[in-house]
Amino acid sequence: MKFSEICTFAVIYAAYLAARRGKRSRAATAHYEVRLLENIVNLVYILKTKIYRPGVFRVFYVYEPKKRLVQAPAFVDKVVQHAIVDNLLYDRITRSFILDNYASQKNKGLHFGLDRLKRFFTDYWNKHHTAEGWVLKCDVRHFFASINHDKLKEKLKKLDLEPVVYDLLCIYIDCSDGLPLGYQTSQLFALLFLDDFDHFVKEQLHIQYYGRYMDDFFLIHPDKEYLQFCLREIRAYMDSLGLELNEKTQIFPIRNGIDFLGFHTYLTESGKVIRKLRHSSIKRMRAKLRHWEKEYPAGLVTREQILQSWQAWDAHAAHGNTWALRQQVRDRVQNILKEEI
């Protein structure tokens, strides 16, 4: 599809539906919908005439699971980004990705990555008949904020994009230092930025058991000295991109388990894989329960808000060996609401 083909009512309306998904209750979405037909017709026009320019983004902090600065685009810019990413960029950028690049892709994601790690552990035990071995666990320091614009643009040029698309993407890139969290394009750009690195680990370092979720990745290997060599090579590669690994990067025994994607996954000597929910997630849920016990009787939180939050946590926790913990939390929620759920 070419840029001119996304400048139609049908494509922009579909992009609008994608942009509003899960956000219909927000003021910006409601404001756009008041004059929906007029807004879409106008957006098609300014895209066709190539006079579209992104607006000012909204800046705020999120605090779960950790404090992060988010730069959210205006709703109309979210619509444009969906139109471009979904129709022009996604397939072109992701077609070279390795299987074990897990973030922000169709049919992948957090739980796909967890299942791949489990498969790696099982395969490792079947191959070596032991849980002895080593893990190199890495995390890129301030990944989004550290992405070099010129190097990213070089990677985009290799995609052979139309000039109008490339120029528009450069505007998104240059709207802030690094890449702004909250932009759909930023997620895809971040994946692209380390795509060559993924191939380097798999094809040059010959690491069979490797997985990455955005800036968080692991290598599993029976030889500690080889992982020490890999770490030196990885640091050099990151330096060439203007990135650095943070202080959490370390090499440790497989038997310690891997803290990845919200769970601590262990390989036992018998070959069993055990997945435990990260302690910080349990701690946050217990804090919520204490707040709900005070706030619900006072009318400061609704039944629907409690159920929505609990159900999201429970669905995530269900991917681990957490039956007893989930029952405990469920019982407390039922006690707060005074009803069975």
Segments the model singles out, each with a brief description of its role:
Residues 51-54, 207-214, 284-297:
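Short, conserved aromatic-histidine micro-motifs
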Residues 1-152:
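Conserved two-metal-ion catalytic palm core of "right-hand" nucleic acid polymerases
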Residues 103-112, 218-221, 253-257:
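Beta-rich nucleic-acid/ligand-interaction surfaces
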Residues 73, 78, 82, 172-175, ...:
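Right-hand nucleic-acid polymerase module
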Residues 39, 46, 115-214, 219-235, ...:
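Conserved polymerase palm-domain catalytic core
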Residues 84-87, 234, 238:
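PAPS/PAP-binding and catalytic site of the sulfotransferase fold
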